[in-house]
Amino acid sequence: MSYRRELEKYRDLDEDEILGALTEEELRTLENELDELDPDNALLPAGLRQKDQTTKAPTGPFKREELLDHLEKQAKEFKDREDLVPYTGEKRGKVWVPKQKPMDPVLESVTLEPELEEALANASDAELCDIAAILGMHTLMSNQQYYQALGSSSIVNKEGLNSVIKPTQYKPVPDEEPNSTDVEETLERIKNNDPELEEVNLNNIRNIPIPTLKAYAEALKENSYVKKFSIVGTRSNDPVAFALAEMLKVNKVLKTLNVESNFISGAGILRLVEALPHNTSLVELKIDNQSQPLGNKVEMEIVNMLEKNTTLLKFGYHFTQQGPRLRASNAMMSNNDLVRKRRLADLTGPIIPKCRSGV
């Protein structure tokens, strides 16, 4: 508090008045002390960091005319440097003469039958346009005029060869309607285990809070009817992915999970994939198009987990490397082959999967 009271005495002082009362010697002393405190002048604006260099005594009177005369005299007395190789003026090679273009032969006058000459003489531009289209002279007209004339037996261009063609009017495509799902009501229906609710679609609802999405994951742990859960484009992040991973370890009904186009990193994706061995009901998982790439290390770990899984049939992710992409494709093909064999044999027990150690 005492330090602040000392500063109060200097609050109303006029710095310009104090600096104006200092002598030149005192100003130099102050400048030297400031140089010691801030040698790089980092606290000053860039335009004020250069010291005053105009205080030196002049070496003599400045006369512009005499300076120009001196520079001109010095330029005349200075000898030009001689060329290392003197210019002889010798011309080598041949002078380029452009070739004469061949002259087009004069077209002979074409004589037509009197009926054709009379018809062409009295034809309008619109009729000539249709005739040119029929004869294949499409360079005289636009594409729209040409195809309209070919597709109609009557005159379709009423304005002639030089008419302005309007572009084709396309029907406006309306924007997709926003997602009409009631977030709070759907959450309550999941908590109440509503048997009529089998698909939850929260796609492109960007204002869902993260705690609400985590509440969905918690509610799905005890739900017995929801088979499809999609949160595409909901700005979900790693905490949501962690909650969904814990849900997959408990839920035994969910078949499809879609978390594409979100902000889930590699750690969140790994948690989701690592939860697959504890889940036997999920057959489709989509994780593509996240805000940041997963990386080669994460992709290899994902493939290792997919090769150990025997129930997942569809995996929505585009691998950047060919090796993980091929291994994941083989794993999904093997799982689908197991389903096909079980369906053909009509077995109720588990089928021993083919060994994938050599994949």
Curated annotation (Swiss-Prot):
Cystine pairings recorded for this chain: none
One Pfam family recorded for the sequence: Tropomodulin
GO cellular component: actin filament; COP9 signalosome; cortical cytoskeleton; cytoskeleton; membrane; myofibril; sarcomere; striated muscle thin filament
Coiled coil: none
Location in or out of the cell: Cytoplasm, Cytoskeleton
Origin: domain of life: Eukaryota
Expression sites by tissue: Highly expressed in the erythrocyte, heart and skeletal muscle.
Gene Ontology MF terms in the entry: actin binding; tropomyosin binding
Chief localization: cytoplasm
Region described as Tropomyosin-binding: spans on this chain: 39-138
Gene Ontology biological process terms in this record: adult locomotory behavior; lens fiber cell development; muscle contraction; myofibril assembly; pointed-end actin filament capping
Span list, region Disordered: 36-61
InterPro entries xref list: LRR_dom_sf, TMOD
Alphabetical keyword list: Actin-binding, Cytoplasm, Cytoskeleton
Family recorded in the similarity comment: Belongs to the tropomodulin family.
Assembly mode: Binds to the N-terminus of tropomyosin and to actin. Interacts with FLII.
PANTHER family: TROPOMODULIN (PTHR10901), TROPOMODULIN-1 (PTHR10901:SF8)
Task performed by this protein: Blocks the elongation and depolymerization of the actin filaments at the pointed end. The Tmod/TM complex contributes to the formation of the short actin protofilament, which in turn defines the geometry of the membrane skeleton.
Protein name in UniProt: Tropomodulin-1
Gene: Tmod1
